[in-house]
Amino acid sequence: MNKTQENALKALQQGFVASCQPVDDGPMDSPMIVAAMAQAAVAGGVAGIRIEGIENVKAVRPHVNVPIIGIIKRDLEHSDVRITPFIEDVYALKAAGADVIAIDATHRVRPTSVEDLIDAIHSVGCLAMADCSTYDEGMYCQARGVQIIGSTLSGYTGGPVPAEPDFDLITRLKQAGCRVMAEGRFNTPELAGKAIEAGAFCVTVGSAITRVEHICSWFQAEVEHAHQAQSEAVA
């Protein structure tokens, strides 16, 4: 590991990352707005930024001095893997300015092996992050030199999505010696704090910070529920 990589990991340690990924095709889905989100997040104290898409990474890079975790999302015909599925994605993210490159590291049918993607990330001098759904996936990537193991995809590979984050996975991976990025359903400050208590090296927060549509829908649902409860009480 070189000095630049060490500095990036040190910057992320026990901080939190803002995932600046607006709703696809929504009114905030433009590189200029993503760059503004990223700058606002840095002003608020984030340790790093997670950015999707080459043009967005390029737009953000000149404006922030914190580590950028870069990804590319694709909708593939014959695979459920979406996050950085191709080696050319790795090269493009590096050229755009990513410090860390995250991949889907689940044990699902994929166009490119996890091993080849990890090798490509390391070959371009970036830190590797594995977005995992299980303990076994995390340990598999840890054994192959991945520097950051994420709980990102826990609960998202089949069946109902749990309401709570997977704290057990975070703790187990930490106890096994992994540097764990807690990610997935950390939508309150309290949950983010619990991630660190559970052993996370860092925690990523997304929708609760940068997806205005989601945030508004949460408030709308609570207000509607309260109105309904009042109406039923009167009746």
Swiss-Prot record:
Gene Ontology MF annotations: N-acylglucosamine-6-phosphate 2-epimerase activity
Catalytic reaction equation(s): an N-acyl-D-glucosamine 6-phosphate = an N-acyl-D-mannosamine 6-phosphate
Similarity field: Belongs to the NanE family.
Gene name per UniProt: nanE
CC per GO annotation: cytosol
Gene3D superfamilies linked to this entry: Aldolase class I
Organism: Photobacterium profundum (strain SS9)
Pfam name, any one: NanE
Lineage: Bacteria, Pseudomonadati, Pseudomonadota, Gammaproteobacteria, Vibrionales
Protein task: Converts N-acetylmannosamine-6-phosphate (ManNAc-6-P) to N-acetylglucosamine-6-phosphate (GlcNAc-6-P).
Keywords: Carbohydrate metabolism, Isomerase
Identification of the protein by name: Putative N-acetylmannosamine-6-phosphate 2-epimerase
GO BP, one annotated term: N-acetylneuraminate catabolic process
